[in-house]
Amino acid sequence: MAVHLTRIYTRTGDDGTTGLSDMSRVAKTDARLVAYADCDEANAAIGAALALGHPDTQITDVLRQIQNDLFDAGADLSTPIVENPKHPPLRIAQSYIDRLEGWCDAYNAGLPALKSFVLPGGSPLSALLHVARTVVRRAERSAWAAVDAHPEGVSVLPAKYLNRLSDLLFILSRVANPDGDVLWRPGGDRTAS
């Protein structure tokens, strides 16, 4: 799939509408647009985390793959489901979710069991991965809202992908804290120093 952008602004959205992949026009507040915009924001958050660098090139490669997947999720969410499409649309497949689950299992196997909730923080990379995780959680909620608003026209697989992705980002945020997790100490268990 080749993308050619010769001009960034078109003025076609100045009336509060935008075009979906099938060239139909919808309000910029349409649930599908909100969902793929949230995917875009999640991608930017992952990009910010990647900009810090990571000594493990495998994790960098995983995050780059996820960035590409998020573009695929956006393409899926912006392409209404129709019978017999003229061109086969780009869709999130179960294999994307399976790949995330494989990474979840592999990276989680090397981490200690949790004894409390984890606070976002620790290393800068870990903190940014937590930011990305929370944006992905919002994108997931937006994707489910799009499914609810357009039950026959939006696939559930992008929402499922985003659900699993937030799990992986949580795991990777823990991996990115080599000195250990920053754990929540409930109520009376904490004192300011």
UniProtKB/Swiss-Prot annotation:
Q: What is its EC number?
A: 2.5.1.17
First-level EC class? transferase
Q: Which GO terms describe its biological process?
A: cobalamin biosynthetic process; porphyrin-containing compound biosynthetic process
Q: In what pathway does it function?
A: Cofactor biosynthesis; adenosylcobalamin biosynthesis; adenosylcobalamin from cob(II)yrinate a,c-diamide: step 2/7
Q: Which reaction does it catalyse?
A: 2 cob(II)yrinate a,c diamide + reduced [electron-transfer flavoprotein] + 2 ATP = 2 adenosylcob(III)yrinate a,c-diamide + 2 triphosphate + oxidized [electron-transfer flavoprotein] + 3 H(+); 2 cob(II)alamin + reduced [electron-transfer flavoprotein] + 2 ATP = 2 adenosylcob(III)alamin + 2 triphosphate + oxidized [electron-transfer flavoprotein] + 3 H(+)
* Keywords carried by this UniProt record: ATP-binding, Cobalamin biosynthesis, Cytoplasm, Nucleotide-binding, Porphyrin biosynthesis, Transferase
Tell me which domain of life the UniProt entry assigns to the organism this sequence originates from: Bacteria
GO terms (molecular function) for this protein are: ATP binding; corrinoid adenosyltransferase activity
Provide the residue positions that the database annotates as binding ATP: 10-18, 28, 137-142, 163
Name the major location.
cytoplasm
| Residues annotated as transmembrane | none
Subcellular location per UniProt equals:
Cytoplasm
User: Which Gene3D superfamilies does this chain map to?
Assistant: Cobalamin adenosyltransferase-like (1.20.1200.10)
GO CC term (a single one): cytoplasm
Q: Which Pfam families match?
A: Cob_adeno_trans
PANTHER family (UniProt xref): CORRINOID ADENOSYLTRANSFERASE, CORRINOID ADENOSYLTRANSFERASE MMAB
Family named by the database record: Belongs to the Cob(I)alamin adenosyltransferase family.
- Please report the name of this protein according to its UniProt entry: Corrinoid adenosyltransferase
- Organismal lineage: Bacteria, Bacillati, Actinomycetota, Actinomycetes, Mycobacteriales
